[in-house]
Amino acid sequence: MHIDNLNIQKLVQIVGVAKLSVKEMLEVIGLKNREHFLNYYLNPAIANGYVCLLYPDKPRHPRQRYLLTEKGLALYKELEK
């Protein structure tokens, strides 16, 4: 599986098998601008089916976390090789 978006690859590697909040992902990536992160990392990863919400019916849930989908896990395993 090849993916051209390096931001999605980076996000998939960071999330891995964990469930992370936006704040946690920002800290690990080293970004400070939440809007930039959402527009260029998280939203494209969700739109392309690599990441999903822990509470999909409540996007603003106070304990919202993000995790990899099956497609995201497949990419994660490939990147770990």
Question: Where do the protein language model's features map onto the residues?
Answer:
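C-terminal regulatory or interaction extensions
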Residues: M1-K81
